């Protein structure tokens, strides 16, 4: 450019000279004006660079108002499904392996769905039919047990039923069996108090609960250390409470229970049971009577003969769930919640027992994974802090939970300000549909906002009329609360930590490979009360047989003894 510069050049000539210089960029020569032109163009270049750098902004074209989008369920299934191991069935096209170490997620799943949304049919029953691990199943109305029991027996499961609908036929559960030291007694009593305290209780004075706790700790510690195993149960606790008489007008009166602890103190002055009983005895006569009445009312269910028998011994064998395939069904009535705290105690002691087995016997991880399928979770009385702590740590022990609720309002009522902690401890969230407004709003916010292109048209009429079209970017919810409410009943929304949400069809129970072995597939319903090898199961009619005379089959000499038990009966 310096070679073509001449003093007095007009702008048109200057542009022509610039074009010719650009046409021959390598025709270089050093002239007297070269330093001046080099300086000018260097300054211009520096100005352009400075303006460009200072004008840069953090722009995300197409995501100005949000980047939410739907994920691909088939791509997710390819990553999370365990092709060689057992899986959980979440939707028709998405399965997730129960071994969280492979996909780096826990398998705690929160399932939300209103009445009739298919919580049991599209999630609960299909995952029981998988027969992938040991299971503890909360089963309102015993529906899952009736449908799947026969299949589980065929697959080699031991089916155990804790039945609060029909306690007379239930397997027995004795909480004392799972108490191994004094510390666990304190934990059991704390959980019992929490489980039997109404969730909406507004008592501001903790005195009564603490006094009840001290008395119950004294009684249970006494039984643990002094009573034979057959007397270590809540029926005996109620007997001891009945023996704890208090006379308000006689401070020197000693009840049979007072004498019992007095004799223990003579033998063992440092007994922890005596220490806790002394705390209770510090209460004045009228106060002590109120404490006894309060404890008696709290544990009144154990005075019922059916419940006393139910908790007299133990047949659940919780420690075996992580060692072989066991299906423990906790059948609860859907119209009466008064005894549901027993199920809460089972879950609490189950977690403690499995943790002990994993840590002390199996080097930190159970050989058989355990799935806690908590249908109608709101009806289970579980201590809030204990369960949240377990939910955060159970993955490493091969334990996982499926928490099924009808709406988010239930969680908020149960956990108050901590409900989001429970949601955060579940890496998968499955929404099946419902009618509760707050749930619609929560799901909509969880989906996020997307950026869309909008076009607006403006037209003004008249003598000076005009017409314009305006294109712009705006944001909207991926699904508005109203769109969440209108979700197709055959579809569901699945959230996975770190992944985009997906919409997919709910799992079709009738397409499960094991459906023919269930009641839905035409098989007979399972009846756990029917005894194996009962008279009705014999292949022959008893009326066709007669009992022989004793002389016909008893040997006269010891050498003639043979295994001929079949000769007791013979056809007529």
Positions of PLM-derived features:
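Basic- and hydrophobic-enriched, low-structure N-terminal and domain-boundary segments
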Residues: 1-117, 121-124, 449, 460, ...
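Conserved ATP-driven motor cores of ASCE-family P-loop NTPases powering translocation/secretion/packaging/pilus
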Residues: 391-493
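Short alpha-helical interface patches
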Residues: 17-23, 41-44, 50-87, 182-192, ...
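P-loop NTPase motor domains
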Residues: 64, 105-399, 414, 424, ...
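Intrinsically disordered, low-complexity N-terminal regions enriched in serine/proline/glycine
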Residues: 29, 44, 78-79, 86-87, ...
């Amino acid at each position: 450019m310096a070679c073509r510069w001449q003093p007095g050049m007009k702008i048109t000539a200057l542009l022509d000279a610039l074009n010719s210089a650009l046409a021959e960029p390598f025709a270089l020569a050093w002239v007297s004006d070269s330093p001046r032109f080099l300086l000018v163009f260097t300054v211009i270049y520096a100005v352009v660079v400075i303006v460009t750098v200072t004008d840069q902004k953090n722009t995300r074209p197409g995501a100005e108002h949000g980047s939410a989008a739907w994920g691909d369920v088939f791509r997710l299934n390819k990553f999370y499904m365990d092709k060689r191991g057992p899986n959980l069935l979440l939707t028709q096209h998405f399965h997730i392996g129960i071994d969280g170490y492979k996909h780096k997620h826990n398998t705690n799943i929160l399932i939300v769905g209103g009445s009739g949304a298919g919580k049991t049919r599209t999630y609960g029953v299909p995952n029981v039919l998988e027969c992938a691990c040991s299971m503890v199943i909360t089963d309102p109305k015993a529906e899952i047990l009736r449908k799947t029991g026969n299949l589980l027996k065929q697959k080699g499961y031991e089916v155990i039923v804790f039945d609060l609908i029909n306690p007379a036929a239930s397997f027995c559960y004795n909480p004392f069996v799972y108490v191994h030291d004094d510390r666990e007694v304190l934990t059991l009593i704390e959980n019992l108090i929490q489980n039997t305290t109404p969730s909406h209780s507004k008592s501001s004075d903790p005195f009564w609960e603490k006094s009840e706790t001290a008395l119950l700790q004294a009684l249970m510690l006494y039984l643990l250390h002094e009573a034979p195993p057959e007397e270590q149960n809540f029926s005996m606790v109620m007997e001891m409470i009945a023996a704890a008489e208090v006379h308000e007008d006689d401070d020197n009166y000693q009840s049979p229970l007072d004498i019992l602890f007095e004799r223990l103190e003579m033998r063992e002055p440092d007994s922890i049971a005596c220490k806790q009983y002394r705390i209770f005895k510090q209460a004045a006569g009228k106060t002590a009577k109120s404490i006894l009445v309060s404890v008696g009312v709290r544990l009144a269910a154990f005075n019922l003969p059916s419940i006393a028998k139910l908790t007299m011994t133990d047949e659940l064998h919780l420690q075996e769930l992580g060692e072989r395939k066991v299906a423990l069904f906790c059948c609860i009535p859907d119209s009466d919640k008064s005894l549901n705290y027993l199920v809460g105690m089972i879950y609490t002691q189950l977690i403690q027992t499995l943790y002990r087995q994993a840590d002390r016997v199996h080097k930190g991880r159970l050989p058989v994974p355990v799935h806690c399928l908590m249908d109608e979770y709101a009806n289970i009385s579980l201590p809030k802090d204990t369960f949240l702590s377990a939910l955060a740590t159970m993955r490493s022990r091969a334990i996982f939970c499926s928490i099924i609720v009808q709406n988010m309002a239930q969680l908020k009522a149960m956990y108050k300000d901590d409900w989001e902690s429970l949601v955060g401890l579940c890496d998968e969230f499955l929404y099946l549909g419902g009618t509760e407004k707050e749930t619609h709003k929560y799901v909509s916010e969880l989906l996020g906002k997307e950026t869309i292109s909008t076009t607006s048209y403006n037209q003004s009429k008249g003598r000076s009329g005009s017409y314009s079209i305006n294109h712009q970017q705006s944001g909207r919810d991926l699904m508005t609360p109203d769109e969440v409410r209108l979700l197709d009943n055959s579809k569901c929304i699945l959230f996975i930590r770190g992944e985009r949400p997906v919409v997919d069809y709910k799992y079709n129970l009738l397409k499960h490979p094991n459906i023919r072995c269930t009641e839905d597939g035409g098989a007979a319903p399972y009846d756990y009360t029917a005894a194996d090898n009962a008279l009705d199961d014999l292949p022959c009619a008893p009326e066709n047989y007669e009992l022989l005379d004793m002389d016909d089959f008893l040997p006269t000499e010891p050498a003639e003894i043979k295994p001929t038990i079949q000769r007791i009966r013979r056809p007529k």
